[in-house]
Every structure is written in C-alpha cells, then in structure tokens.
Amino acid sequence: MHMFPLGVVEDSDPPGPPIGRASGSPPPGAGRSTAKPEELLKEATEANIVVRRTAGLNEKLAFHNNTPPTLPTPRRKAPTTGSVLNANQACNAVNLAPLDTPQRFRAVYMSITRPLDNGYYTVPRRMLEFRSVNAVAFNLLVTLRIDKAIGPGKIIDNAEQLPEATFMVHIGDFRRKKSEVYSADYCKMKIEKMGLVFALGGIGGTSLHTRSTGKMSKTLHAQLGFKKTSCYPPMDINEDLNRLLWRSRCKIVRIQAVLQPSVPQELRIYDDVIINDDQGVFKVLQTVVPSNARKRPPSQ
C-alpha cells in the first residue's frame, strides 16, 4: 500500500494553541499492513514528525519521525528514519516556516492506495528526457475536473475558481529504424492499437496510471522498460497542480494525444498535432477521487 498523509506544518511547543505555518504532505512510501484505514490514520495523527528546512540545489524539507510506525511494515527506510524532499513538492508555503522555531508535521487525514499487484512502475527520468532526431514525441494532455475544496478548514482557496486543470505527460517517442519520420496518421493508428486505459490513484499525491491492453510499438515498449503499466505522479510533473489537488476532489474528463517533434529545435518549425478521443479509443476508469479516501488504480 502507498500512504499519502496531508496535514499542517506548525510550531512544535507553542505556549498557546499551535500556530499553523503551512500545509504539507510528505509521502512516506510503501508498506504492508492488514490494519484498517482508521487504525492507520490514528497512528499517523499520533506520530511525532519533526520538520526542518534545508537546501541543496533547491530548498528542501527534512521530515524525521520520532515515533516509527508499528502497523505498516515499511518497504523502505523513509517511514522509520525520515526523508528529505523538494520543499515545493511537500509544502505549499515553505517560506512561512521559521528556522528559529522548531516545527512539526501534524497529519490531519490520509489517503491509501492499494495496487492490485506488487507495486507500480514509473518511467526513469532519463528516458523521459531522451530526445531523438526524426522522431515523433507521444504526449498526453490530461484534463481534470476539480470540485471545490473538501471540509470547513480549506487550505486551498482558489479551488472554486479552477473547475478544470490540465497537465501533460510524455509517454515516449515513435521512431523508425531508418532516417524517416512517421506521419501523424501512422502514429495515430499505433496509438489506437495500444488500447490505453487510464485511472487516478494516490501515489505521491494524486497520480495518473496508464495501462496498455493492446499491441505496442517495440521501440516504445523498450522506452517504457518493457512494461505495459506506468504511473505518473503530478508531484514530479506539475508541483502547483499537485498542491491544488491536496484538498480537492477530481476526476478525468478528457484525454488527448499530442504529437510533437522530439527535438526541441524543431518545435518552432512543426505545429502540434492534437488527437481528440472522438471514437472512444481511450478508456477511463471514471471514479471521482476525493483526497481523503482510499484510491485504487487500474491493475498494475
């Protein structure tokens, strides 16, 4: 299972009521447990998690759990020894957390994703950044319908003003062995044969899960690590959208394929080719995903 707590970064030992500085969400990673969700939430809310600001290439937050979990059996050391995360991925306003006052993270609620098999697969970052001459980049433009923030204590104030939001993910490149470029129609045919299925989960925040149920290009299959299922967490793709979805309900309303030149220099020459799903080529497992409920992605 993958747990995703959301809570408040606040002063550790205030003389009066705790002063909340910002909202945060440190993904603790994967673990195994047979406990009920209510028991896992109780343990998360009682945890003593220390938060400290630090910096490297960018500003970071260090989370240290002084009360290691007993119900889930962690697969990694993060839930027991702590973790250091990009501040923009784990906090909505790190600039408000003071250095001269000890800070802690207090969990308010959490979501739990139970994959249908042993885990999930994310495409390596180097492969996502790989570009090739005379190749066509296959991207997806995902449109989410966002309901207003949940609960009386809203952390996100502008959720009502943003009924829909989009983010783009890179799937891979279509490339011939010879120095010839595939036509847009040929790429569209290959996409239709893939039989793509999409759903939302809760790994590292609200995550997009894809599964190919049909025939896949050998080159594209190799780029995806010879896997037919992939996970794309928005916390790695679009940090602003990820923070927006912390306290919002959302569902997929539209998925479009976008064909672009693989090499950035050619973007100024060739226009985008947008393929709308008018014939139901893409299948979406349509469930409204609230942030404070268990989420189940498609079969991995």
Curated annotation (Swiss-Prot):
Subunit structure: Homodimer. Dimerization is critical for virion formation. Interacts with host ANP32B.
Keywords, in A-Z order: Host cell membrane, Host membrane, Host-virus interaction, Lipid-binding, Membrane, Viral envelope protein, Viral matrix protein, Virion
Subcellular location: Virion; Host cell membrane
General function of this protein: The M protein has a crucial role in virus assembly and interacts with the RNP complex as well as with the viral membrane. Associates with phosphatidylserine (PS) and phosphatidylinositol 4,5-bisphosphate (PIP2) at the plasma membrane. Interaction with PIP2 triggers matrix protein lattice polymerization. Matrix proteins induce host membrane deformation and curvature necessary for virion assembly/budding.
Protein name: Matrix protein
Region of interest (Disordered), residue spans: 1-36
InterPro entries: Matrix_C (IPR042539), Matrix_N (IPR042540), Matrix_Paramyxo_C (IPR055413), Matrix_Paramyxo_N (IPR000982)
GO terms, biological process: virion assembly
Database matches in Pfam families: Matrix_Paramyxo_C, Matrix_Paramyxo_N
Listed GO MF terms: lipid binding; structural constituent of virion
Gene: M
Entry annotated with the keyword tRNA-binding: no
CC terms in the record's Gene Ontology section: host cell plasma membrane; membrane; viral envelope
